[in-house]
């Protein structure tokens, strides 16, 4: 299967996404979270899109960002914006970046686009990719719910905070806390012991 077929509809909606996602929503929350990391730390950005605003903020703050996205159009834009960043056009499930480890992983706006079993796979793969004391930040609604994605018109699924806590605990990961951004998006801050 081509990476763009695993983009959850974002290859087809890439132009609209890039025009809509240039806002700074989430940047202050991600920057607050990243303050616990040492400048220069390696961060894997899963579902990085065109890199704005999350990868951009992390790069500006001196982190070594590795971006992964299944949309060829979004990845092309990412590479143009950040030519020195590591980038891979791939679904996270197939990413070669999981052959190494990272100080942190972010998945902002990705988790709920995935089917439930793939969400659990993502958490498992992140655990394996994190260094000891590595940090993981992802977004998904607190409530267990299903809705239609505004850009792709595809189904989005939140498994709910309690389910995420249980999966994280089963993987040996520690939920450090929850944060919200100015758009009321819920962030789960996780640490690998």
Locations of the language-model features?
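Class I (Rossmann-like) S-adenosyl-L-methionine-dependent methyltransferase catalytic domain
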Residues: 1-38, 49-97, 114-121, 125, ...
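Short catalytic micro-motifs in class I SAM-dependent methyltransferases
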Residues: 109-113
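A conserved beta-strand element that flanks and buttresses the S-adenosyl-L-methionine
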Residues: 106
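Conserved beta-strand/loop positions that form the S-adenosyl-L-methionine
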Residues: 46
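Nucleotide donor/acceptor-binding cores
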Residues: 41-42
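Glycan-recognition surfaces
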Residues: 129
């Amino acid at each position: 299967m081509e990476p763009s077929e695993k983009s959850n509809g974002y290859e087809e909606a890439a132009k609209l996404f890039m025009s809509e996602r240039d806002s700074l929503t989430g940047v202050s929350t991600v920057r607050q979270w990243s303050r616990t990391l040492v400048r220069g730390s390696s961060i894997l950005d899963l579902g990085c899109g065109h890199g704005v605003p999350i990868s951009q903020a992390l790069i500006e703050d001196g982190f070594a960002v590795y971006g992964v996205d299944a949309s060829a159009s979004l990845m092309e834009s990412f590479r143009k914006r950040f030519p020195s960043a590591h980038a891979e056009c791939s679904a996270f499930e197939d990413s070669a970046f999981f052959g190494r480890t990272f100080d942190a992983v972010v998945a902002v706006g990705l988790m709920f686009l995935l089917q439930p079993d793939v969400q659990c796979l993502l958490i498992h793969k992140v655990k394996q990719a994190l260094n000891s004391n590595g940090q993981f930040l992802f977004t998904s609604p607190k409530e267990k719910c299903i809705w239609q994605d505004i850009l792709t018109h595809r189904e989005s699924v939140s498994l709910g905070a309690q389910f995420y806590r249980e999966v994280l605990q089963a993987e040996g990961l520690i939920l450090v806390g929850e944060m919200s951004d100015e758009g009321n998006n819920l962030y789960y801050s996780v640490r690998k012991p």
